[in-house]
A protein has these predicted regions:
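Active-site proximal loop and beta-alpha junction motif in alpha/beta enzyme cores
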Residues: 1-71, 77-196
Length: 196
């Protein structure tokens, strides 16, 4: 079976950088097992699969290399950008069905995609010490930010971690510890950012 996968970067600046996602059109006849296999072959954090829907304009499912997730923001942007660039959709307002519900998406005349998502929910907090060993930085450095380490969800639960200016390039994340932490605490991943 040959399946065309569009490789799209969201959040680019002047066509550079961004967050990559796979986008597969006409996915109605694909099983979840096939979607997972395709996602594993693509190897990006998420691949979006577009299917027809009776109530929404499209149903969009999102798969990582390990399984389906409820929602993915950058893959949503990639999905509707692809539909616009391929002249399947024009500028306007649309709705997509995801595992978290029906969400609006707008495509502006210049092709910019704007999406609505759930309001952020704070789900949990972790100690500086607990996180420091996982990302390879002293707990005192994390604590110096005076910001909590929280699980925030707008559809997927992520651990949000701030580090002081100059420390982002110094962290040494342990991929195995992160994977184990995420599985144990039912979170998707870590979002680490540097304070200015």
């Amino acid at each position: 079976m040959n399946i065309e996968v569009n490789l799209v970067n969201s959040f680019t600046v002047n066509g550079k950088g961004g967050n990559p996602a796979g986008v597969v059109l006409n996915s109605d006849k694909l099983s979840d097992a096939q979607k997972l296999k395709i996602s594993q072959a693509v190897g990006f954090s998420e691949t979006a699969f577009i299917s027809n829907d009776d109530e929404a304009d499209y149903e969009v499912s999102f798969f990582t290399t390990t399984g389906e997730v409820d929602f993915c923001g950058h893959a949503t942007l990639a999905t509707f950008s692809t539909l616009f660039q391929k002249d399947i959709l024009t500028a306007g307002s649309y709705v997509q069905r995801t595992r978290i519900g029906i969400l609006p998406v707008t495509i502006e005349p210049n092709g910019k995609v704007i999406m609505d998502q759930q309001l952020p929910q704070k789900l949990d907090c972790y100690s500086y010490k607990e996180i420091s060993s996982v990302i390879g930085i002293k707990s005192s450095i994390l604590e110096s930010t005076k910001l909590p380490i929280e699980v925030i969800s707008t559809g997927l639960p992520d651990v949000v971690i701030s580090v002081p200016n100059g420390y982002l390039d110094l962290i040494k994340p342990d991929d195995e510890l992160i994977a184990n932490f995420c599985e144990k605490h039912k979170v998707i991943g870590f979002h680490i950012f540097e304070l200015c």
